[in-house]
C-alpha cells in the first residue's frame, strides 16, 4: 500500500512540474542576427522604415518572432496604402543617446539608457497615436491568430520624447500608453495603462509593465495620450521603447 501511495505522489508531483513548466513565459528579446538586420542605418528617413522618401510609396518593413513567441508586426499604412514608419509602427533599434536636450525627431529611435533591458543591445521603439489625422496606431499581434496572454514587457522613454517633454512639462502634466487587446474578431477584450510621464515627472529607466489583465488576445495596439497639447494637437512625441516581451505559451 505504501508503494502505491508513493507512486501516486510521484505522478502528482510530475504533473505539477509539467504544468508549471508549460506556464513559464517565453521572452521576445529582439536579440540576434535576424533582429540586427531590422535596424535601419539612420534613425529618420532610412530605407528600411521609409523606403523611397521621394516617391513615398512605402516599405515592406515587418518582423515575426516565428520560432519563439509568435508575435509579429507591420507598419501602419496611410490613405494611399503606403506603409511608412511615420504612420505608426514598431521599429527595432539599438541607438543610444543620453544627450536628450539635443534630441529631436531625427533621433527618434534612441533611448538614454545603456542599452536594452537587462544589459541587452536591442529593443523596439513604438511610434503612433490615434488622432484626427491618424485613425490607426502601432500594434503587435500573434500571426497564427491563436490567442495568448502577454504577461508583461519592459518600458522606457525615448531620447526624443524626453528632449521635448523635459522642456514643456508642468507639475500636472502626464503622458500614458493605453494598450488595447483584441480577439480574433477585432473585438476589444481588455485595456491597460502605463504612465510615461506623471505629475510632470518622466521615467528614464526600464520599468516593468504588467499586461496580463488584458487576458488572452490576438492583437495589442498601443495608443499614446497626453495632457500636453497646442492648437495643432498633442505635442508630446508619441514614442516609447520596450523590450523583453513575456508571452504565456498557448495551451
Role assignments for model-derived ranges:
Residues 142-143, 167-169, 209-211:
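Leucine-rich repeat
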Amino acid at each position: 500500500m505504501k508503494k502505491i501511495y508513493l507512486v501516486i505522489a510521484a505522478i502528482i508531483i510530475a504533473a505539477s512540474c509539467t504544468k508549471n513548466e508549460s506556464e513559464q513565459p517565453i521572452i521576445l528579446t529582439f536579440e540576434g542576427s535576424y533582429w540586427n538586420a531590422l535596424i535601419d542605418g539612420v534613425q529618420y528617413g532610412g530605407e528600411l522604415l521609409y523606403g523611397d522618401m521621394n516617391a513615398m510609396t512605402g516599405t515592406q518593413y515587418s518582423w515575426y518572432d516565428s520560432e519563439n513567441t509568435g508575435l509579429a508586426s507591420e507598419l501602419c499604412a496611410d490613405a494611399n496604402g503606403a506603409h511608412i514608419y511615420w504612420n505608426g509602427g514598431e521599429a527595432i533599434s539599438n541607438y543610444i543617446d543620453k544627450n536628450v536636450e539635443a534630441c529631436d525627431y531625427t533621433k527618434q529611435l534612441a533611448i538614454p539608457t545603456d542599452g536594452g533591458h537587462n544589459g541587452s543591445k536591442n529593443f523596439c521603439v513604438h511610434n503612433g497615436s490615434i488622432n484626427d489625422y491618424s485613425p490607426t496606431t502601432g500594434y503587435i499581434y500573434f500571426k497564427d491568430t491563436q490567442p495568448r496572454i502577454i504577461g508583461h514587457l519592459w518600458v522606457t522613454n525615448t531620447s526624443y520624447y524626453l528632449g521635448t517633454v523635459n522642456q514643456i512639462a508642468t507639475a500636472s502634466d502626464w503622458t500614458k500608453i493605453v494598450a488595447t487587446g483584441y480577439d480574433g474578431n477585432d473585438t476589444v477584450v481588455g485595456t491597460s495603462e502605463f504612465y510615461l510621464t506623471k505629475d510632470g515627472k518622466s521615467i528614464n529607466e526600464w520599468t516593468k509593465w504588467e499586461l496580463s489583465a488584458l487576458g488572452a488576445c490576438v492583437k495589442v495596439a498601443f495608443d499614446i495620450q497626453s495632457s500636453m497639447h497646442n492648437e495643432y494637437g498633442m505635442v508630446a512625441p508619441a514614442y516609447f521603447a520596450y523590450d523583453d516581451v513575456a508571452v504565456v505559451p498557448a495551451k
